[in-house]
């Protein structure tokens, strides 16, 4: 019974959520697009000509937002009509419906085959921005969940270290609670500038937050 009440409350909140309504109206696949939008507007992350990698991209709202932003900056005299000024590569273990001008690779980005596909698209270029909305399946056991969250952040940090330009940026989702300070410390070890971000589109009751790192301390 309690679970049913929880589901009813969640459904009511979801249906009446202004960001859900806005996403439906503007064609985004999830309200998460507005989290990236707010952070981007504050920190000017996405700019014309960039190479962007979206980790854990499915269902695709972050890639949609990045695609729309790069389409706005398109140089019409040099880019084909309908294209974008830049490159977006989305990766996920799960399938994702196609998005115009977005390269999607399904698989684990730690595996050689997936990395080869990524390198084929990059064509030797370094990455300007890595964005990660990855989140684990939470168990409700604080210590186990903290370890899973930290593991995903570690994967994003390692990917960024291997692929980012020296002045590139990494934005990841994490959660306040056990293990959060350790994640922040890892960011500080890797980046010159580190800042937490809590966009308004994150639900008030959620411990969800984002960490932004800029400028690698030891670029490869």
Curated annotation (Swiss-Prot):
Compartment annotation = Cytoplasm
Keyword S-adenosyl-L-methionine belongs to the record: yes
Binding sites annotated in the UniProt record for S-adenosyl-L-methionine: 60, 62, 92, 108, 133
> Where does it primarily localize?
cytoplasm
Q: Can you tell me which residues form the catalytic site?
A: 173 (proton acceptor)
- SUPFAM superfamilies xref list: S-adenosyl-L-methionine-dependent methyltransferases
Q: Which stretches of sequence are listed as region Disordered?
A: 197-220
Q: Which HAMAP family match?
A: RNA_methyltr_E (MF_01547)
Q: Which family does it belong to?
A: Belongs to the class I-like SAM-binding methyltransferase superfamily. RNA methyltransferase RlmE family.
From the Swiss-Prot or TrEMBL record, give the protein name: Ribosomal RNA large subunit methyltransferase E
Q: To which species is this protein native?
A: Burkholderia ambifaria (strain MC40-6)
Taxonomy of the source species = Bacteria, Pseudomonadati, Pseudomonadota, Betaproteobacteria, Burkholderiales
């Amino acid at each position: 019974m309690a679970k049913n009440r929880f589901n009813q409350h969640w459904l009511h909140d979801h249906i009446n959520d202004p960001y859900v309504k806005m996403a439906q109206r503007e064609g985004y696949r999830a309200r998460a697009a507005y989290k990236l939008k707010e952070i981007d507007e504050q920190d000017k992350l996405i700019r014309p000509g960039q190479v962007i990698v979206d980790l854990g991209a499915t269902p695709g709202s972050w890639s949609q937002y990045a695609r729309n932003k790069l389409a706005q900056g398109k140089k019409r005299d040099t880019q084909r009509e309908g294209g974008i000024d830049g490159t977006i590569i989305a990766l996920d273990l799960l399938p994702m419906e196609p998005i115009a001008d977005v390269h999607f690779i399904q698989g684990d980005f730690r595996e050689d085959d997936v990395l080869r596909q990524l390198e084929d698209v990059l064509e030797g270029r370094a990455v300007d921005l890595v964005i990660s909305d990855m989140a684990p399946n939470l168990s409700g056991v604080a210590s186990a969940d903290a370890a899973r969250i930290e593991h995903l952040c570690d994967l994003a940090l390692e990917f960024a270290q291997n692929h980012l330009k020296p002045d590139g940026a990494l934005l990841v989702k994490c959660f306040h609670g056990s293990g959060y300070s350790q994640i922040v410390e890892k960011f500080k070890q890797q980046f010159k500038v580190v800042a937490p971000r809590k966009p308004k589109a994150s639900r008030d009751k959620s411990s969800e937050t984002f960490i932004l790192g800029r400028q690698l301390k030891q670029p490869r």
